[in-house]
């Protein structure tokens, strides 16, 4: 049980995919303009990351490995991620049309989010079992969501602040992201991974 808690803490805080491993930066910068959009994107990404971790593990363990087709893992994982994203898009469209319109192009772009493929490949490299794969995927998604929502909240506050002209827009966003990364660096050593 302690191992599972360590997996969650390490993926959420210590080895955060956005701020430490620099995966998923496109949606991090693109959707963080408004808190509402960031929360919707974080929910969709959490669902996709967790489900694609499960499906990728199952595809590799029960299809690729027994047939000695491990060299097809990247292509297979991309296909699995695309299917999961399409499923998520259909669910969001049916359950929340407003969120579907707000997320717009960013929802299908989860397919190209390198964090989703990175989680699937890292699960494989770490030789995680099924439960560890699910927790690793969920922890990565929770870490992504935490950082995305915090960053969106900060960007909303910065938008109403008096920022020097040279730093407005993407410049202050990158500076803020760098400071967040330094703050998360403080979690290093919290969990030995």
From Swiss-Prot:
Bilayer-crossing regions: 5-25, 38-58, 65-85, 102-122, 134-154, 171-191
First-listed, main subcellular location of the protein, grouped into a coarse class? membrane
User: What broad class of enzyme is this?
Assistant: translocase
GO biological-process terms attached to the record: electron transport chain
Q: Which UniProt keywords apply?
A: Cell inner membrane, Cell membrane, Electron transport, Membrane, Translocase, Transmembrane, Transmembrane helix, Transport
Tell me its EC number(s), please.
7.-.-.-
Question: Superkingdom of the source?
Answer: Bacteria
Disulfide linkages recorded for this protein, renumbered to the chain, are: none
Protein topology in the membrane:
Multi-pass membrane protein
Q: Which residues form the signal peptide?
A: none
What is the protein's quaternary organization? Answer: The complex is composed of six subunits: RnfA, RnfB, RnfC, RnfD, RnfE and RnfG.
Record-linked HAMAP family: RsxA_RnfA (MF_00459)
The protein depicted here goes by the name Ion-translocating oxidoreductase complex subunit A
Q: Which organism is it from?
A: Marinobacter nauticus (strain ATCC 700491 / DSM 11845 / VT8) (Marinobacter aquaeolei)
Q: In the record, what lineage is assigned to the organism producing the protein?
A: Bacteria, Pseudomonadati, Pseudomonadota, Gammaproteobacteria, Pseudomonadales
Gene name of the encoded protein: rnfA
